[in-house]
């Protein structure tokens, strides 16, 4: 039996998704929860191996097991810390969460202070469609041509929510796109320079660095014919935990904001 789990996690608590020795990772936390629950499994595959600091609202992992308890999200939620299982569905035996994905949706939360929001929006449109993203990724030997299906800039007041959807992404691609949009909004990078970079014409010394990982959220992984109904009790627990963290962080944010007014 193969079961796909839709999971959320606070990426600031982990050294990335993929299991590594001597550090806390999302994959390691899930495996520990499976073992502590007494659930035997053969393999665990993920849709996205997010970097250190990157959070998720809808990453997907597939687990092969004969233990029916895995279909109840609360079994693992009772053992997990900083990770939440929101949904569990049975899938075909050949399902692979990465290769079966139709698209992934990422959202970046960028502080909008001093930014020309209209310039950010204008620059964002340049990334739509098929381009060479070698200037906007950490090159690891893979083909650098990718296609962005959708990019939106939502003005939320103190922050911009920049949402990007594509079938596949390169390493650090979203974070480098966001940094480029920020530089455009600050007037430090022109639209023409961005166009040249998207044609693969750039000096390595001028390559745009990535925006901080902590602002990035993997919102959703989409599949054809596979839905993830959210478990009521799992959602209740997740919201309660998130609201507690939000209250703590917003109090600290306002404290820092007040200190800037001296």
Swiss-Prot record:
<dbReference type="InterPro" id="IPR020103">
    <property type="entry name" value="PsdUridine_synth_cat_dom_sf"/>
</dbReference>
<feature type="binding site">
    <location>
        <position position="106"/>
    </location>
    <ligand>
        <name>substrate</name>
    </ligand>
</feature>
<dbReference type="InterPro" id="IPR020095">
    <property type="entry name" value="PsdUridine_synth_TruA_C"/>
</dbReference>
<keyword id="KW-0819">tRNA processing</keyword>
<dbReference type="InterPro" id="IPR020097">
    <property type="entry name" value="PsdUridine_synth_TruA_a/b_dom"/>
</dbReference>
<dbReference type="InterPro" id="IPR020094">
    <property type="entry name" value="TruA/RsuA/RluB/E/F_N"/>
</dbReference>
<feature type="active site" description="Nucleophile">
    <location>
        <position position="51"/>
    </location>
</feature>
<comment type="function">
    <text>Formation of pseudouridine at positions 38, 39 and 40 in the anticodon stem and loop of transfer RNAs.</text>
</comment>
<dbReference type="GO" id="GO:0003723">
    <property type="term" value="F:RNA binding"/>
</dbReference>
<dbReference type="Pfam" id="PF01416">
    <property type="entry name" value="PseudoU_synth_1"/>
</dbReference>
<protein>
    <recommendedName>
        <fullName>tRNA pseudouridine synthase A</fullName>
        <ecNumber>5.4.99.12</ecNumber>
    </recommendedName>
</protein>
<comment type="similarity">
    <text>Belongs to the tRNA pseudouridine synthase TruA family.</text>
</comment>
<keyword id="KW-0413">Isomerase</keyword>
<dbReference type="GO" id="GO:0160147">
    <property type="term" value="F:tRNA pseudouridine(38-40) synthase activity"/>
</dbReference>
<dbReference type="InterPro" id="IPR001406">
    <property type="entry name" value="PsdUridine_synth_TruA"/>
</dbReference>
<dbReference type="GO" id="GO:0031119">
    <property type="term" value="P:tRNA pseudouridine synthesis"/>
</dbReference>
């Amino acid at each position: 039996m193969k079961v796909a789990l839709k999971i959320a996690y606070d990426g600031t608590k982990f050294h990335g998704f993929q299991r590594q020795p001597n550090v806390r990772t999302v994959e390691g936390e899930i495996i520990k929860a499976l073992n502590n629950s007494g659930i035997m499994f053969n393999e665990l595959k993920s849709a996205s191996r997010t970097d250190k600091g990157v959070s998720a609202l809808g990453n997907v992992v597939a687990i092969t097991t004969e233990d029916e308890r895995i279909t109840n999200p609360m079994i693992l939620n009772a053992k997990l810390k900083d990770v939440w299982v929101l949904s569990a569905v049975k899938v075909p035996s050949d399902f692979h969460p990465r290769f079966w994905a139709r698209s992934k949706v990422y959202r970046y939360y960028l502080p909008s202070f001093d930014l020309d929001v209209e310039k950010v929006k204008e620059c964002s449109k340049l990334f739509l469609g098929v381009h060479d993203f070698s200037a906007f990724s950490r090159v690891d030997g893979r083909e650098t041509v990718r296609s962005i299906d959708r990019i939106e800039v939502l003005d939320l007041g103190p922050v911009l929510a920049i949402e990007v959807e594509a079938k596949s992404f390169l390493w650090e691609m979203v974070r480098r796109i966001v940094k480029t949009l920020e530089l455009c909004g600050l007037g430090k990078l022109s639209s023409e320079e961005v166009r040249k970079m998207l044609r693969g014409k750039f000096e390595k010394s001028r390559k745009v660095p990535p925006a901080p990982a902590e602002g990035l959220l993997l919102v959703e992984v989409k599949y054809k014919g596979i839905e993830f109904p959210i478990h009521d009790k799992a959602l209740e627990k997740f919201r309660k935990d998130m609201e507690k963290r939000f209250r703590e962080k917003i109090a600290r944010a306002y404290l820092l904001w007040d200190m800037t007014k001296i």
